[in-house]
C-alpha cells in the first residue's frame, strides 16, 4: 500500500491517478524507474535536490505532499474505471478540505475530468477550487506519457512560480 504524504500548511499536494505495480511493491509513490516525477519536481524548483522514491517523506520538508485518486494498483492507469475515478474525486475533496494546501495538482486531464466531473480541461490552473486551494492540472510524469521532459518541467515550474507569486 502506498500511503498519502499529507500535512497541514503544504504549498502543493500532487495527486497521481493510482499506484503502479512498482509503487505498490515498494510502498513508495512514483517508484517505477521510468516515472519522471522526482526529476520533474526537482527541475521545476519544488525541491533543491532530486529525491528518490524511498525519500518520499522528505517532500514534507519542501511543503509538498502526494496522494492519489484511486488506491488500487494497476499496470496502466487506463485499467481504472470512470466510477473508481469519480469515487476517488469525492474522497480527494474531503482530504483537501481537511488539509487545505495552497494548490492541488492533478496529474493528468482524464484524472481531473473523471474525478471532478469536468469536461474540456486545459493544462494549468483551473477555475474550480476547493475552499482556498487552487486546482491545477499538470501532465502525468509516467514513463508511459508521451509528454517530453522539457514540457513536464515547464508545466510544473509554472505552478511553482505561481505559488511563489502568491507568497507561499
Swiss-Prot record:
One of its GO terms (molecular function) is DNA binding. It is found in: Cytoplasm. It is an enzyme of class 3 (hydrolase). Its main location: cytoplasm. CDD domains: UDG-F2_TDG_MUG (cd10028). InterPro entries: MUG/TDG (IPR015637), MUG_bact (IPR023502), Uracil-DNA_glycosylase-like (IPR005122), Uracil-DNA_glycosylase-like_sf (IPR036895). GO terms for cellular component: cytoplasm. One of its GO terms (biological process) is base-excision repair, AP site formation. Binds DNA as a monomer. Excises ethenocytosine and uracil, which can arise by alkylation or deamination of cytosine, respectively, from the corresponding mispairs with guanine in ds-DNA. It is capable of hydrolyzing the carbon-nitrogen bond between the sugar-phosphate backbone of the DNA and the mispaired base. The complementary strand guanine functions in substrate recognition. Required for DNA damage lesion repair in stationary-phase cells. NCBIfam families: PRK10201.1 (NF007570). This is G/U mismatch-specific DNA glycosylase.
Amino acid at each position: 500500500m502506498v500511503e498519502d504524504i499529507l500535512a497541514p500548511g503544504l504549498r502543493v499536494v500532487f495527486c497521481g491517478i493510482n499506484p503502479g505495480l512498482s509503487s505498490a511493491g515498494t510502498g513508495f509513490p512514483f517508484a517505477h524507474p521510468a516515472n519522471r516525477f522526482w526529476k520533474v519536481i526537482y527541475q521545476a524548483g519544488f525541491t533543491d535536490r532530486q529525491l528518490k522514491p524511498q525519500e518520499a517523506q522528505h517532500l514534507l520538508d519542501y511543503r509538498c505532499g502526494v496522494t492519489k485518486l484511486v488506491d488500487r494498483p494497476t499496470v496502466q492507469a487506463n485499467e481504472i474505471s470512470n466510477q473508481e475515478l469519480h469515487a476517488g474525486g469525492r474522497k480527494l475533496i474531503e482530504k483537501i478540505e481537511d488539509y487545505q494546501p495552497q494548490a492541488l495538482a492533478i496529474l493528468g486531464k482524464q484524472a481531473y475530468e473523471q474525478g471532478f466531473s469536468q469536461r474540456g480541461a486545459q493544462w494549468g490552473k483551473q477555475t474550480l477550487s476547493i475552499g482556498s486551494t487552487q486546482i491545477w492540472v499538470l501532465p502525468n510524469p509516467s514513463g508511459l506519457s508521451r509528454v517530453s521532459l522539457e514540457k513536464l518541467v515547464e508545466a510544473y515550474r509554472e505552478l511553482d512560480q505561481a505559488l511563489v507569486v502568491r507568497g507561499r
